[in-house]
């Protein structure tokens, strides 16, 4: 607790210094530090397809990430979060067709294993995105379940001993809402897809599905992964925080048995009090959406020149989160792949961008930096693709540049 309170005090002390340093433009030489080997890290978020192309095909890949490990380490980052790398029919890859493989556009399982090994040699932890709330509509679990349901006679009930995959999703013999879609080839069955018709929701309360994801964890831990970023964790079961916490806890506990240093950070895109409730899962980190985003505490403090408001927010986070999990590790950020980049939010003001970055790095926990933030990359338009544009490596040299 003393450490966390100290981080809040540091914000007050450094706010003026960071701002003055940004305005004056005078740099200082920093000594290298020996960082403790724990789960307090500085993470760098990477959309692999837009990061660095190692083979000239226009697509970023795992080999490209490996080539840039020194760059990432020199930034002061000792953790990497890879956005989805599993096979998927979409560019963003949040709809998975195989949870135990690497999308061929990004490389191979051996490439991932080599990347993990190279990360560990440099003291970098490597975590990957796991979209467990839903699969792709092209996943064999879903296609086999749909084929089975389409073959049932009128009034016949599904039998999971005949087709176990009918229990893997939320199927119904009636359309229960606007997020339910007709099973292909059937006029009698529907399935839930909260985000999109091509992202059918998985039934994560099913012991069989939970077992599947334990096997998924085994696969990636064997390849060298150090942790998971859990996508859409608050949507596993809608409006069911306790059930979702239980789902997270079970998988995290299983992973910790395999690797005692295993790390998990979850996406709970909600207010501070809801995020606090998810710390009851016993998992270490939740992304702090109250601090991040265009209307978050960090940006507000920079816009208004008001460090006291940020300190008050930090103290509230520490109080509320620690009550649910005394060992929590906050996960603050400025922006990510689902929102406008921080440079856009701060209207490309270099002083404010640097101040925001400086404040982020003073916060307690493990801060997350979105690739390109360190050079003030921005984006135009509101489409998600615009938020995941190719990393800019040089104004003149196109080596490694992706096509996006």
Where are these regions (language model features)?
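Noncatalytic carbohydrate-binding groove/subsite architecture in carbohydrate-active enzymes
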Residues: 268-360
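Short beta-strand segments
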Residues: 45, 81, 227-230, 265-267, ...
């Amino acid at each position: 607790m003393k450490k966390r309170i100290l981080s809040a005090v540091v914000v007050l002390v450094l706010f003026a210094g960071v701002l003055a340093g940004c305005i004056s433009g005078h740099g200082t030489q920093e000594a290298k530090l020996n960082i403790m080997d724990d789960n307090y890290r500085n993470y760098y978020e990477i959309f692999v397809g837009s990061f660095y192309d190692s083979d000239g095909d226009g697509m970023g890949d795992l080999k490209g990430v490996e080539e840039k490990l020194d760059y990432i380490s020199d930034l002061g980052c000792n953790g990497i979060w890879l956005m989805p790398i599993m096979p998927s029919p979409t560019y963003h890859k949040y709809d998975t067709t195989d949870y135990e493989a690497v999308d061929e556009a990004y490389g191979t399982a051996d490439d991932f294993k080599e990347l993990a090994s190279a990360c560990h040699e440099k003291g970098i932890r490597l975590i990957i995105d796991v979209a467990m709330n839903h699969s792709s509509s092209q996943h064999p679990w879903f296609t086999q379940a749909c084929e089975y349901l389409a073959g049932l006679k009128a009034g016949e009930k599904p039998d999971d001993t005949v087709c176990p995959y009918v229990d893997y999703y939320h199927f119904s013999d009636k359309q229960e809402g606007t997020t339910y879609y007709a099973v292909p080839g059937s006029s009698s069955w529907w399935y839930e897809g909260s985000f999109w018709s091509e992202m059918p929701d998985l039934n994560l309360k099913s012991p069989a599905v939970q077992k599947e994801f334990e096997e998924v964890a085994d696969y990636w831990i064997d390849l060298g992964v150090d942790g998971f970023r859990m996508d859409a964790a608050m949507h596993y079961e809608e409006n069911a925080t306790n059930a979702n916490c239980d789902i997270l806890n079970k998988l995290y506990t299983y992973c910790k048995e395999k690797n005692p240093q295993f790390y998990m950070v979850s996406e709970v895109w909600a207010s501070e009090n809801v995020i606090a409730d998810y710390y009851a899962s016993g998992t270490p980190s939740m992304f702090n959406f109250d601090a991040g985003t265009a209307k978050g505490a960090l940006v507000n403090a920079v816009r208004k020149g008001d460090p006291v408001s940020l300190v008050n927010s930090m103290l509230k986070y520490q109080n509320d989160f620690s009550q649910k999990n005394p060992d929590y590790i906050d996960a603050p950020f400025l922006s990510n792949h689902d929102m406008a980049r921080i440079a856009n939010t701060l209207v490309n003001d270099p002083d404010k961008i640097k101040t925001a970055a400086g404040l982020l790095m003073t916060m307690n926990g493990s801060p997350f930096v979105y690739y390109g933030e360190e050079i003030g990359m921005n984006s135009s338009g509101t489409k998600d693709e615009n938020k995941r544009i190719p990393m800019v490596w040089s104004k003149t040299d196109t080596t490694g540049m992706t096509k996006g």
